Swiss-Prot record:
Assigned protein family: Belongs to the RRN7/TAF1B family.
Biological processes, Gene Ontology terms: nucleolar large rRNA transcription by RNA polymerase I; RNA polymerase I preinitiation complex assembly
Subcellular localization, as worded in the UniProt entry: Nucleus, Nucleolus
Keyword flag Protein biosynthesis: no
Zinc finger (RRN7-type): 19-51
The keyword Chaperone belongs to this UniProt entry's keyword annotation: no
Protein name (database record): TATA box-binding protein-associated factor RNA polymerase I subunit B
Binding site for Zn(2+): C21, C24, C42, C45
A GO cellular component annotation in the UniProt record: RNA polymerase I core factor complex
C-terminal cyclin fold: annotated span: 282-284
Organism name: Oryza sativa subsp. japonica
Length: 634
């Protein structure tokens, strides 16, 4: 607004202003409201007057200090000419206002990244990164133990043991060694010397300082991840469960970590909630520090647990064979009261070294050894030594035809003359049914909806989206839900049509004509036998026909046969049916379990041979002693 007294307009935006365009030469009067984002536009050519900007500031919003007294003075008398703008505060010769640094405020905006020199020298950066990394791993371990106790029914003893193991593991890793920083700086210096030799002098600018700072940070992080890997929290959890005699297996830990039921992949989001933002005390974000590249496998996890126990000097017991074997038998629907006592005798007699954790990643896991003991116990109890039990089951199914009730595995009538054969037949039928029921897949892979939710909550957690991206996501979700409903309706219609056309009249044979199911179906026994042969070939096994007669009462040791330039395993069908569900439950290859069974049987045969020799020696000593005590006749 204009001054009624004819004084000059205030410098903070009052009154009008006359501007002349630099391009077209047109001059015009502009008011305060004519500015667009602080700039005035020519009314003739629409050019922007860059020389003048409307700041719309009020001098009364600032404190009246001696340095500001000359900034504005309310005009009380008309003056012929306006006073010039005051000089900047930095150029004032008088007492200047205090800087922002003196008021305790940061010199840089908080919304922007910190400068290269904000974290101090490399020693301070190393200390900050190391302290944040170790504390963050401890928070992740704490969350994992809480999930094990609350969701997976692990005892509190395992949680208390994990704390002690973790502290000893951190101490053994020497992550807080005073010489660690100097070693890392020496490595970084040698790397920089190699790079500086290939650069010219003009490249050594201020931007190189920030690059050097970043290289230091990631060098420290790489070293910390080698000494204390992120997956070491999972290894400590499994090791604590092992010492506490829990039935938790490495496969359970890996599956829960992959599915998000155990905080691991997305655990870095919980670190900031407990420790605060990492930007306050560490140049690296929590995602860079604790985001794992992949989930470790079960074999590597067990080897990592054994390595930690070896480094901290922890004497480990063997696996809890009784509870783990009981769990496996229960999942396979096998009689626990009959099988478990015999398996425990073999365990106490043989005591194989594979039942203890090892730091060797190439050794057979301990759960495979437990499975091998159970398989040997089943072979001894039920006499599964290649007598053709599965072939007899296939012939029985072929005889009963296509009647589903008569061909069911559990509908076989027992033979009163040979109850052991019936037990073996029922065992193989139960194992064949249990093999199809075992589900080793992840929960998120069951359907697309659960997989998308898994990706949102676990894989891409911590990522932010714009409003437009969120709107597109909502649109795609609505499209997916609509198509999903349509697919469900179509599947329901197809199921109803199949039920109508599979009653024995409208079923189409391969030649294109409709006939009864019996006229075009192959014998069920031949189908079952051909199916098991093809599956054996896929898994590296060769089918062997049943044995006609037993050569000996010892263990049946299978050898390997050369086929197409490679060695493959040979086995009978009944033994393969016994082997297959145990391997699937242990999540290992069938050949690995087969090799473990052969190794255990050789060990048992060697022990039995040594025991027999010892008994014979004792008997001979007893006979010699009795001969010496016998009186000599005249």
């Amino acid at each position: 607004m204009d001054d009624d007294g004819g004084g000059s307009p205030g410098h903070y935006g009052g009154g009008g202003i006359h501007l002349v365009c630099e391009y077209c030469g047109h001059g015009s009067e502009y008011a305060e409201d004519d500015a667009d984002d602080g700039f005035f536009t020519c009314r003739q050519c629409s050019a922007i007057h860059t020389s003048t900007q409307n700041t719309a500031t009020n001098p009364f919003d600032f404190p009246m200090t001696p340095a500001h007294l000359s900034a504005h003075r309310r005009p009380t008398q008309p003056t012929p000419t306006p006073k010039p703008f005051p000089a900047p505060r930095g150029a004032a010769t008088g007492a200047a206002a205090p800087d922002f640094d003196d008021l305790g405020e940061p010199s840089e905006p908080r919304d922007f990244a910190t400068g290269a020199n904000a974290w101090g020298n490399p020693e301070d950066v190393a200390a900050r990164v190391r302290w944040r990394y170790v504390r963050g791993l401890q928070v992740i371990l704490q969350r994992q133990l809480e999930a094990l106790v609350e969701r997976h029914r692990v005892g509190s003893l395992a949680a208390s043991l994990a704390g002690t193991i973790w502290l000893r593991w951190v101490a053994a890793s020497k992550v807080f060694d005073e010489m660690w920083v100097h070693k890392m700086l020496a490595i970084a210096a040698s790397v920089e010397e190699g790079h500086s030799a290939s650069k010219d002098k003009q490249s050594e600018l201020e931007g190189d300082a920030q690059k050097s700072q970043s290289s230091y940070e990631f060098l420290f992080l790489r070293s910390l991840r080698m000494m204390l890997p992120v997956y070491s929290t999972l290894a400590v959890c499994f090791l604590a469960c092992h010492v506490a005699r829990e039935t938790i297996l490495p496969t359970d830990i890996c599956r829960w970590a992959m599915e998000g039921k155990l905080p691991y992949v997305a655990a870095f989001t919980q670190v900031d909630k407990l420790l605060g933002s990492s930007l306050n005390d560490c140049p690296l974000s929590s995602r860079q520090l604790f985001r794992p590249t992949r989930v470790i496998g079960a074999w590597q996890l067990e080897a990592a647990a054994g390595s930690i126990a070896q480094k901290i000097g922890l004497l480990l017991p063997s696996v809890n064979f009784y509870l783990i074997a009981q769990r496996f038998l229960k999942e396979l629907s096998l009689p626990i009261e009959k099988i478990l006592p015999h398996a425990c005798r073999i365990y106490e007699w043989a005591m194989p070294a594979e039942l203890w954790l090892s730091s060797n990643p190439g050794r057979v896991p301990s759960r495979v050894c437990v499975m091998a003991i159970l398989i040997v116990a089943l072979r001894v109890l039920y006499g599964i030594n290649g007598q053709g039990i599965w072939e007899s089951i296939a012939q029985t199914e072929n005889a009963v035809g296509s009647d589903p009730e008569a061909s069911a595995p559990h509908s076989i009538e027992p033979d009163s003359n040979n109850s052991e054969e019936f037990d073996a037949r029922e065992l193989l039928c139960t194992l064949a049914a249990s093999y199809d029921k075992i589900n080793v897949g992840h929960d998120y892979s069951k359907e697309v909806h659960s997989y998308l939710k898994y990706c949102k909550d676990v894989v891409f957690t911590g990522m932010t989206f714009s409003l437009e991206e969120e709107h597109l996501i909502d649109i795609f979700w609505d499209m997916y839900k609509g198509k999903e409903v349509m697919l469900l309706d179509e599947n329901a219609k197809l199921c109803q049509e199949k039920l109508r056309t599979t009653n024995g009249v409208n079923k189409r044979c391969r030649d294109g004509r409709f006939a009864d199911t019996k006229c075009c179906s192959t014998p069920l026994g031949n189908c079952a036998l051909q199916s098991i042969k093809s599956k054996m070939e896929e898994n590296g096994f060769c089918y062997v026909s049943p044995r006609k007669r037993l050569v000996s009462d010892g263990y049946l040791l299978y050898t390997r046969r050369e086929s197409s330039g490679s060695l493959i395993y040979v086995a009978h069908a009944d033994y393969y049916i016994l082997l297959r569900p145990f391997a699937k439950l242990a999540e290992v290859d069938v050949r690995v379990l087969h090799s473990s069974v052969l190794k255990l049987e050789r060990r048992l045969g060697w022990i039995e041979e040594r025991v027999g020799r010892s008994l014979n020696t004792l008997q001979n000593l007893h006979d010699e002693a009795s001969d010496d005590e016998r009186p000599v006749s005249d």
